[in-house]
Design a protein with these regions (language model features):
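Acidic, glycine-rich calcium-binding repeat modules characteristic of RTX/beta-roll
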Residues: 486-487, 505-512, 517
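Eukaryotic tandem repeat interaction scaffolds
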Residues: 436, 443, 452, 462-463, ...
Length: 570
């Protein structure tokens, strides 16, 4: 009976070993630790000796020489020991030319085997993304240097998905390197280095100055303040949860730079990097150190995206623009709406004659319509927070002769004058300025509209329903939800191809009259692609009140008796 129990324990351990041998992810450290524990067997038994042989061979194949070295002396047969020492030397020599390793502060090397399932020759391998993990590094709490990348001179992609190495050797030998990705995750760091607080990895130990073919740098959890890179222009620098400086943004010649939730080491960012075409910086001021000023006047960038969010206090004070900008997003919000905030000053906006697309949050920067450059083609107003405009403010967009898309998710005004150039309009307002009684778009020429009115307030008081909502003759596509209007007039819209009207409001807030165009043709609403419509036709009236009068309702429209009007499939 005792022998049977021993055999079961041996088989269980052997199965565990065979399973773990297939595990390649560094996240399996705890599983690997299971098989490093001693088992309750007689070391001189045939079963245990067989187990040792398999265990040693597994260690050697994954270049864990220090573990194999501990076990070889436990082999009872001298010839077997000699055979494994020969095998040890074979794999050790292989590791020198086909592996990598951690160089510890003591000078010792812990070898790492590169994950290479297709067994491509090291000199030809183009992508290195993972290793067979050395789990005992978890308990060392040591800073290390990574060695061995020179064995892979053809690498085009180098990715460290969970890396806390402070220095990497032989990067200069990767002449074909195009993409370098490194992630240092805080939670994983604290799991590995149990006695140290996490801080972004200092990239001073990474020298990329000789990698002239670099195309993309993708970093998460690192400090790029001291990073050395090639002087050649690359495509992308992406940094998340890290640290950057004004100098690093100027010294790294990337056409696109994306910074997200990272600390700005400098209060002022003065960008003169001529390589940058697009700069995006998104900051959560509650978790990251924000900057107070950004000046791109002397740069050549065309696209600028600046967003700062926080709970109570805005840090950014001023944005100085350059005349080459064609796409601008300025936004962010303060969660505490009751805390007065200073608006962000935009310098040079009215001079941006090349600006095609502008997206802004009025709570961040309440731009006056008179300051909008005349060549804008897309205007997007939205975001959380207050709308610091007044009833007397002008919202005259008529001078924007090239405006094609107008999107406003914040407000509408009795003083609003839209450009006749608009082709598509998107309205999702919650606030009203001025004495708004009706919305009459009959003088405009847009072909597409997506509008949700909901509950409108003026000075925190809900407004009564609009008297009339009138749409232009040019309209082809309409999605209208909760119109908050007594009359919805579509009588001019004889070119309609897609119509969706939803009115979930009831009682006095429901639409009183819906006027459709006369002589609508069923064939005009035949849809070709999937959409919100459930059948073959792009025509649907939903949640329509039983008291609502529908004028000119076509005979080919079917009413289900519950407020839905649609077209049956052919």
């Amino acid at each position: 009976m005792k022998g049977i129990l021993k055999m079961k324990k041996y088989l269980y351990t052997l199965l565990s070993l065979l399973f773990v041998a297939t595990i390649s992810s560094c996240e399996k450290g705890d599983l690997l630790n299971i098989i490093t524990q001693d088992i309750d067997l007689n070391e001189n038994s045939k079963e245990y000796q067989q187990y040792l042989k398999e265990r040693i061979e597994s260690y050697l194949k994954t270049y864990r020489f220090e573990e194999a070295k501990k076990l070889v002396p436990k082999l009872t047969e001298e010839e077997t020991q000699k055979r494994f020492w020969v095998l040890y030397n074979k794999y050790h020599q292989e590791a020198l030319t086909q592996g990598c390793g951690y160089i510890l502060a003591s000078g010792d090397t812990l070898f790492l085997k590169v994950m290479n399932i297709d067994e491509i020759a090291p000199s030809q391998l183009k992508a290195l993304t993972s290793f067979y993990d050395y789990v005992e590094l978890k308990g060392t709490n040591q800073e290390t240097t990574l060695w061995g990348l020179g064995n892979y001179p053809a690498l085009e992609t180098l990715s460290f998905p969970s890396c806390f190495v402070s220095k990497v050797k032989d990067l200069d030998k990767l002449k074909q390197l195009r993409v370098f990705s490194l992630t240092a995750d805080k939670e994983k760091y604290e799991w590995w280095f149990t006695s140290k607080a996490f801080k972004p990895i200092d990239m001073a130990g990474y020298d990329l100055s000789k990698n002239d073919k670099l195309d993309s740098l993708l970093f998460d959890g690192v400090d790029i303040s001291n990073l050395k890179v090639t002087s050649n222009t690359m495509r992308l620098l992406s940094l998340k949860h890290g640290i950057y400086t004004n100098a690093s943004l100027n010294n790294i010649h990337a056409r696109h730079i994306d910074i997200e939730n990272s600390d700005a080491a400098d209060d002022e960012l003065i960008i003169n990097n001529k390589a940058i075409q697009r700069l995006s910086i998104e900051t959560n001021a509650d978790n990251n150190k924000p900057f107070k000023l950004i000046n791109v006047a002397n740069s050549s960038l065309h696209k600028l995206y600046v967003v700062e969010t926080s709970m109570e206090q805005r840090t950014l004070k001023k944005v100085i623009l350059n005349e080459n900008i064609d796409t601008l997003t300025i936004g962010g919000y303060i969660s505490r709406g009751d805390v007065p905030q200073q608006s962000v000053e935009l310098v040079g906006l009215s001079r941006l004659n090349r600006l095609k697309r502008l997206s802004y949050n009025p709570d961040f920067s309440p731009i006056a319509t008179k300051d909008l450059p005349k060549n804008i083609e897309g205007l997007y107003i939205g975001g959380s927070g207050n709308v610091p405009y007044n009833d007397g403010d002008s919202f005259d967009y008529s001078h924007l002769s090239k405006l094609k898309i107008y999107s406003n998710g914040k407000f509408i005004s009795a003083n609003m004058k839209l450009s006749t150039a608009i082709d598509s309009i998107y309205l999702f307002p919650s606030q009203v300025f001025g004495d708004l009684k009706a919305l009459d778009f009959s003088g405009l020429k847009f072909t597409k509209a997506d509008i949700y009115i909901g509950s409108l307030t003026r000075n925190d008081v809900e407004l009564p329903m609009l008297k009339r909502f009138v749409f232009p003759a040019t309209l082809k596509q309409l999605k209208l939800s909760n119109a908050q209007s007594e009359v919805v007039d579509l009588s001019r819209c004889t070119h309609l191809k897609s119509l969706y009207v939803d009115d979930s409001r009831t009682g006095e807030r429901a639409i009183k009259k819906l006027i459709l165009p006369k002589n609508l043709k069923k064939s005009d609403f035949k849809r070709q692609h999937k959409s919100e419509f459930e059948n073959d036709y792009a025509f649907k009236l939903s949640d329509i009140n039983n008291e609502t009068v529908i004028e000119n309702l076509p005979s080919w429209v079917e009413n289900d008796g519950n407020g839905t009007y649609s077209v049956p499939n052919d």
